[in-house]
């Protein structure tokens, strides 16, 4: 490719809406352009990198025997209604009606469709196991699309699905995908971790995430020297609960004008934050639920959804709370809340004389005690585990790092085959539900994650495996330099090197800045050193070296880098 013909409009300033490095750099370097919130056009440089990412993923899928298909993006509502997820999936599902008033969705995932696909095709245990995958566009109506391609409404994803006649067979295939995903990370060149994760809206009973480390990541990875690693959405709390042994005090209802947050309540009443109980109200398919957690801990929404078995669960709106309870947010509490289902974290069992909302505007209860003042019948682990909490395996303090989820694999079991009544005949002639697994990888998200992990003040630092072009020939000089550069360009093309030549009529400074901004892994400068029989070769982010202006030696130097 000639830079003079390349469509890669670069920008000298960060876009005003860019929140993180990848969002800024991918736009500045001419990889993407924003069309609407969470919707992007991928320009030629981005397409080249995306195709290289896709090919790495495709090669690793093919190696483990997965077969590529392509399913439609638009899916009929009946499939999702049959599985029970039409209402459960939540507002992230983009729904639409056709001209005949039939309901459809722009697929956020394809479990229902692929299960329906094999209904009349896989009939016998002799045909199993089977793994199918696709690379396609998906849609999720994110409430706040942000961070560029890391959380977009429209994105490119690889999703795979496996069908089995036994859990042992699923375990084997699950491990194949787990190993393949690690190889994908390694081939791309990312620092990563494999962690235990929540199953979320997909369902199932076991899952793992593949997380690329990045300071701006939204995933919190907790890990231990013993080898344990997990998402903070999943890690169970195994710490000791601080037990209050003081005598019960008389319940008081205290006037607390305009005091709503835990911090405000603690300051106003002069009590430690740990002596406050947060009362959070959610709305799901079975109505309202009040969740109770100690004031010094955060509620783990994924744990609550998993406990309730309700992925449609959402935080109740202020208007809904006022209508249902007659109390504004900030003054809710369990005392007197007899008609709502209450689920509490284990830590509250050991608290005495604590503070809760007074179920009346501008009031809180002081010296509240369990059983005497209210009852809880449902107890579970509801808190977010933090850095320093005990490892659930060995008990040592957990460490933490932020990351970006790129891959997620699930053991689905019979969740979808049961709900959609899709069966096969086993070796005894009995009809049984397929045991399933599913395996997702964010292709376009990987584009952003690489930039988040690999960049500096000058621009992107692409690994050679996924760079849009591996080698950039920068022509600095007149006829002799141009003539040599053209010969070198043709030679490298013939040798299969992914090369671009910067033949633009612009200053050397502009060429060097664009090379660093775009992030070409290797830059060859053909300039004044050519008179001495040398060219300059520089790896991105490293010092330049001089190499003899000999085609074969230049190629050897490239291959050794």
Swiss-Prot record:
Q: Which PROSITE patterns match?
A: AA_TRNA_LIGASE_II (PS50862)
Keywords from UniProt, A to Z, are: Aminoacyl-tRNA synthetase, ATP-binding, Cytoplasm, Ligase, Nucleotide-binding, Protein biosynthesis
> What GO molecular function annotations does the UniProt record carry, in alphabetical order?
aminoacyl-tRNA deacylase activity; ATP binding; proline-tRNA ligase activity
Task: Please indicate which superkingdom the organism of origin belongs to.
Answer: Bacteria
Q: List the disulfide bonds.
A: none
> Biological process (GO) annotations?
prolyl-tRNA aminoacylation
Query: Reaction catalysed?
Result: tRNA(Pro) + L-proline + ATP = L-prolyl-tRNA(Pro) + AMP + diphosphate
- EC code: 6.1.1.15
Which CDD domains did the record assign?
A: ProRS-INS (cd04334), ProRS_anticodon_short (cd00861), ProRS_core_prok (cd00779)
Per the record, GO CC terms? cytosol
Subcellular location(s) per record: Cytoplasm
What's the entry's take on its domains? Consists of three domains: the N-terminal catalytic domain, the editing domain and the C-terminal anticodon-binding domain.
What is its biological role?
Answer: Catalyzes the attachment of proline to tRNA(Pro) in a two-step reaction: proline is first activated by ATP to form Pro-AMP and then transferred to the acceptor end of tRNA(Pro). As ProRS can inadvertently accommodate and process non-cognate amino acids such as alanine and cysteine, to avoid such errors it has two additional distinct editing activities against alanine. One activity is designated as 'pretransfer' editing and involves the tRNA(Pro)-independent hydrolysis of activated Ala-AMP.
Q: How does it assemble?
A: Homodimer.
For this chain, the family text in UniProt reads: Belongs to the class-II aminoacyl-tRNA synthetase family. ProS type 1 subfamily.
Mind telling me what this protein is named? Proline--tRNA ligase
Name the gene. Answer: proS
């Amino acid at each position: 490719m000639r830079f003079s013909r390349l469509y890669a409009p670069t920008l000298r300033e960060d876009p005003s809406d860019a929140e993180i490095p990848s969002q800024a750099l991918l736009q500045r370097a001419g990889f993407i352009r924003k069309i609407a919130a969470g919707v992007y056009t991928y320009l030629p440089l981005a397409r080249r990198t995306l195709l290289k990412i896709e090919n790495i993923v495709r090669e690793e899928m093919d190696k483990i025997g997965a077969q590529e298909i392509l399913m439609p993006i638009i899916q009929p509502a009946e499939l999702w209604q049959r599985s029970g997820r039409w209402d459960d999936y939540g507002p992230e599902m983009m729904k639409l009606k056709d001209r005949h008033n039939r309901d459809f969705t722009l697929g956020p995932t394809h479990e229902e469709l692929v299960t329906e696909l094999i209904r009349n095709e896989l009939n016998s245990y002799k045909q199993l196991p089977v793994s199918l995958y696709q690379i396609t566009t998906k849609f999720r109506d994110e409430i706040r699309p942000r961070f560029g391609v890391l959380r977009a409404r429209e994105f490119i994803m690889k999703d795979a699905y496996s069908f089995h006649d036994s859990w042992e067979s699923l375990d084997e295939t699950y491990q194949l995908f787990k190993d393949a995903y690690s190889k994908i990370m390694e081939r791309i060149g990312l620092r990563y971790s494999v962690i235990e994760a929540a199953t979320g809206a997909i369902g199932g009973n076991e899952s793992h995430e593949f997380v690329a480390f990045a300071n701006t990541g939204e995933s919190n990875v907790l890990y231990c020297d013993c080898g344990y690693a997990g998402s903070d959405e999943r890690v169970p709390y195994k710490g000791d609960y601080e037990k209050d042994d003081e005598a019960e005090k008389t319940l008081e209802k205290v006037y607390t004008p305009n005091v709503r947050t835990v911090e405000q309540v603690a300051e106003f009443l002069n009590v430690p934050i740990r002596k406050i109980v947060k009362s959070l109200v959610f709305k799901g398919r079975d109505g309202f639920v009040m969740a109770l957690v100690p004031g010094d801990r955060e509620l783990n929404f994924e744990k609550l959804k998993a406990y309730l078995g309700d992925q449609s669960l959402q935080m109740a709106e202020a208007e809904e709370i006022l209508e249902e309870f007659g109390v504004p947010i900030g003054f809710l509490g369990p005392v007197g809340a007899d008609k709502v289902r209450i689920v509490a974290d284990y830590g509250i069992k050991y608290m005495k004389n604590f503070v809760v909302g007074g179920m009346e505007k501008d009031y809180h209860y002081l010296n509240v005690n369990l059983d005497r003042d209210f009852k809880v019948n449902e107890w579970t682990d509801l808190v977010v585990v933090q850095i320093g909490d005990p490892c659930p395996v060995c008990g040592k303090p957990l460490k933490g790092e932020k990351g970006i989820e790129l891959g997620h694999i699930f053991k689905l079991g019979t969740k979808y085959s049961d709900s959609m009544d899709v069966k096969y005949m086993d070796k005894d002639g009995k009809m049984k539900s397929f045991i399933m697994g599913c395996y997702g990888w964010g292709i376009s998200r990987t584009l952003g994650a690489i930039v988040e992990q690999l960049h500096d003040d000058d621009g992107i630092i692409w690994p050679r495996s996924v760079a849009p072009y591996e080698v950039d020939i920068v022509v600095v000089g007149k006829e002799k330099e141009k003539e040599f550069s053209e010969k070198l360009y043709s030679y490298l093309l013939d040798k299969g090197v992914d090369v671009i030549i910067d033949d633009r009529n612009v200053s050397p400074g502009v060429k060097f800045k664009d090379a660093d901004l775009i992030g070409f892994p290797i830059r060859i400068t053909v300039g004044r050193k050519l008179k001495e029989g040398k060219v300059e070769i520089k790896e991105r982010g490293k010092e330049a070296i001089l190499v003899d202006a000999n085609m074969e030696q230049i190629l050897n130097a490239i291959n050794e880098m």
